Design a protein with these regions (language model features):
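N-terminal small-domain helix-loop-helix segment of the aminotransferase-like
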Residues: 2-83, 90
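Short, conserved active-site loop motifs that form the nucleotide-linked donor/cofactor pocket
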Residues: 78, 180, 205-206
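Glycine/small-residue-rich loop that forms an oxyanion/phosphate-binding "nest" at active or ligand-binding sites
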Residues: 83-91, 182-188, 192-193
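PLP-dependent aminotransferase-like
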Residues: 94-152
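Helix C-cap/helix->beta junction micro-motif
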Residues: 119, 177-178, 203
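Active-site phosphate-binding strand-loop segment of PLP-dependent enzymes
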Residues: 130-190
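PLP-dependent aminotransferase class I/II
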Residues: 205-252
Length: 252
């Protein structure tokens, strides 16, 4: 008799990446860098590839310090992750109990659906109109004392739509009043140019995730990070694997 997985895991549907070679396709499905990196970047990276670099465990502390300096934050406010996806999963691991309500817009980044089901959350969705219009009031009215987590990709994928700074602030205040955590996924923020990063110092209910995969074109490196108040980041840190990222990611 086969060993049965947990019932909610058995219900999940996930596709395997079975294509042998995707390089000859226009890979618009994952928004990968199709033009490659400058030769100088590759040459600089090769200088890191020594025997010690490959055989020793990664030292993440220099990258933490560098990010803290660039973002104007303390290292205790930053959590490195395997892409922004890894940071998002850590949020669910640290904060979402079975039965908690998680609010997302729809359609949006696919992994929100996966993690909501994986951690047995009750998924709430605020849907777009046919013209890809989503009034912020539609999101606000779905936030309640039962809401544990609100996930907003800004800009949103796949719609490319954005919430303004004023709208994000309204969502944050409603989340605070309801005791919910507000996650803003800024994976595509470089294409929009506006960030909510400066709100981190104002709220203990806000998290922001970013990735090196999109605008920086480093999808294979699997490097991202989450930022928030030290208490929230400390809880994410408790969920990390032995090493948050690999040595190749630290080189960037």
């Amino acid at each position: 008799m086969p060993v049965k997985p947990r019932a909610h895991i058995a219900r999940l549907q996930r596709l395997r990446n079975v294509d042998d070679n995707r390089s000859h396709y226009m890979r618009l499905d994952k928004n990968e860098n199709l033009t490659g990196l400058p030769d100088a970047v590759i040459a600089d990276f090769r200088q890191f590839i020594t025997s010690d670099f490959v055989t020793t465990y990664p030292d993440t502390s220099p990258l933490y310090r560098k990010l803290a300096e660039q973002l104007g934050l303390d290292v205790t406010q930053i959590y490195l992750s395997s892409g922004s996806d890894g940071g998002i999963k850590s949020v669910f691991e640290a904060y979402v109990e079975p039965g908690d309500q998680v609010l997302i817009v729809s359609p949006t980044y696919a992994m929100y659906y996966v993690y909501a089901n994986m951690f047995r959350a009750e998924l709430q969705e605020a849907g777009f109109d046919l013209g890809l219009v989503l009034p912020v009031e539609r999101v606000l009215e779905k936030i309640s004392p039962q809401t544990k987590l609100v996930c907003i990709a800004n800009p949103n994928s796949p719609t490319g739509t954005v919430f303004s700074r004023q709208e994000l602030t309204k969502i944050l205040r409603k989340a605070e009043d309801s005791g919910a955590l507000f996650l803003i996924d800024e994976a595509y923020y470089e294409y929009y140019g506006e960030t909510a990063l400066d709100l981190i110092g104002e709220s203990k209910h806000l998290l922001i995730t970013r990735t090196f995969s999109k605008a920086l074109g480093l999808a294979s490196v699997r490097l991202g990070f989450a930022v928030g108040c030290a208490d929230i980041i400390g809880n994410l840190f408790k969920t990390r694997p032995m090493y948050e990222i690999n040595a190749f990611a630290t080189a960037f």
